[in-house]
Amino acid sequence: MKVTKSEIVISAVKPEQYPDGGLPEIALAGRSNVGKSSFINSLINRKNLARTSSKPGKTQTLNFYIINDELHFVDVPGYGFAKVSKSEREAWGRMIETYMTTREELKACVQIVDLRHAPSAEDVNMYEFLKYYGIPVIVIATKADKIPKGKWDKHLKVVKQTLDMDPEDELILFSSETKKGKDEAWGAIKKMISR
């Protein structure tokens, strides 16, 4: 997909702040520091629309980005970061759950995992949550450039097994450095929004 327009619309914490207009939405979820912002920026060919941070757990709101006036990307707060208070974590959990379970415009969730490591307990919980609520999911295994090509299949197998992935769900190898998987990711997203 050729992106000619991409900008942040709103950072929301409650449903009344979500944008109107009925555009399809793709949520992006992943552990803090998994490379979510880099994934968004490389998909839309922008250096810093989604702010990348060396401080994990920085996104504490649902950030809605409009893409080509056709769809919204919704950047969800990173999960699994220890330096955040329990009450903050619970508040984020409620905010994410409310959005994911009630938003009619939500077409799918892109769950981003780090190819270098087996998915964490939080990754597994997130995947199970999405499956439980019947939210279509695309799993992106990022940071592929950090692993020798010959080991990709082995690492992808670990991701599939740890998440106990539904064979119907797409698993895409991705690198924001080399742009590997960018076309496949857009292809999967387009399929979801046209359903």
Swiss-Prot record:
The entry's Mg(2+)-binding residues are 37, 59
Which InterPro entries does the entry link to?
Answer: G_ENGB_dom, GTP-bd, GTP-bd_ribosome_bio_YsxC, P-loop_NTPase
The SS bond pairs are none
Q: Which GO terms describe its cellular component?
A: cytosol
Q: Domain named EngB-type G: which ranges?
A: 22-195
Spell out the molecular function terms from Gene Ontology.
GTP binding; metal ion binding
Identify the domain of life.
Answer: Bacteria
The protein here is known as Probable GTP-binding protein EngB
Q: What does this protein do?
A: Necessary for normal cell division and for the maintenance of normal septation.
Q: Which family does it belong to?
A: Belongs to the TRAFAC class TrmE-Era-EngA-EngB-Septin-like GTPase superfamily. EngB GTPase family.
Q: Which Pfam families is this protein grouped with?
A: MMR_HSR1
> Which Gene Ontology BP annotations are present?
division septum assembly
Residue positions binding GTP: 30-37, 57-61, 75-78, 142-145, 174-176
Species of origin reads Bacillus velezensis (strain DSM 23117 / BGSC 10A6 / LMG 26770 / FZB42)
Q: Which NCBIfam families match?
A: GTPase_YsxC
PANTHER family the record matches: ENGB-TYPE G DOMAIN-CONTAINING PROTEIN (PTHR11649:SF13), MSS1/TRME-RELATED GTP-BINDING PROTEIN (PTHR11649)
What gene name is given for the protein in this entry?
A: engB
Keywords per UniProt:
Cell cycle, Cell division, GTP-binding, Magnesium, Metal-binding, Nucleotide-binding, Septation
Q: Which cofactor does it need?
A: Mg(2+)
